[in-house]
Amino acid sequence: YHAENKQVFLGYVIGLDYQNPHLSPFDEFQRFKTHPDIKKIIEGGKRISYGARALIEGGIQSLPQMFMPGALLVGCDAGTLNMPKIKGSHTAMKSGMIAAETIYEHLTKNINLSTYEQKFKESWVYKELYEARNVKPSFSWGLILGILFTGIDQILFRGKLPFTLKHKHADHEALKPADKMPKIDYPKPDNVITFDKTSSVYLTGTIHDDNQPVHLKLKDPDLPIKYTLEKFDEPAQRYCPAGVYEVQEVNSVQKFVINAQNCIHCKTCDIKEPSQNITWVTPEGGGGPKYGN
């Protein structure tokens, strides 16, 4: 996206249902920037900001119950992103407007908050998401078949095919053992077009109070070394875009290290961790990235 003051916003989206545990989304993004068509846009510029976030792109098949006592889920908290367009601001705002109407009716007329979900399904947001519902799951068949099906679904039928594809598995179930997948050799950053995680995290303005409790919880502290490292070559070292997780050797013993102060709260670890051993919880108030641009 081209913005004012000669600024360019550049992003890269990778589905978290990838199979190769050696893959690093951060390094794939760096490699993407070296493509001639991308490089010519950013060459000669200065990197001024960085961020990362897990997107909810499951569509209506992944929508949870959107109401509960005293609260409503709106926007990306619910999952209103239009995956084919990679756009969600408009749907998020509309869901917020519907939520506001529902809350007003609840306070003035004592109407149950559950009406929010019905109002949402009657809105243009749900219609838009419904028409896009089959795009994401179709790519589980592979890139070529996914593109062909999406063309038929979106161009010929405009999202009105008489069936809905299902998501076959959770993202964390997609990883295959490390010894079954090819290793990926990523080039070292040149600090001109490509950069490392440490300097990138600095640009997020991430701040956490010293000595606060670690907000990334391990259900079993021994599992990363005894299971995940052995089977998947500890993919947390790569799927985390902020360098939070490391395997270090201390006194000839391998140790799983959590650099929680680097966390930019993308929540990828909570989603992609194959053992589901990592749980992201809310850090102390005010902690996290502070995007200055």
Task: Give the label of every model feature segment.
Residues 1-51, 90, 109, 117:
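Conserved FAD/dinucleotide-binding core of flavoprotein oxidoreductases
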Residues 52-83, 200-215, 223-239, 246:
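FAD-binding beta-loop-beta segment adjacent to the flavin cofactor pocket
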Residues 67, 73-80, 89-103, 112, ...:
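Extended, hydrophobic alpha-helical segments in both membrane/secreted and soluble proteins
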Residues 79-85, 97, 101-144, 257-259, ...:
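Active-site-proximal substrate-binding core of FAD-dependent oxidoreductases
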Residues 139-192:
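C-terminal auxiliary extensions adjacent to catalytic cores
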Residues 230-260, 268-290:
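Iron-sulfur cluster-binding cysteine motifs and their immediate structural context
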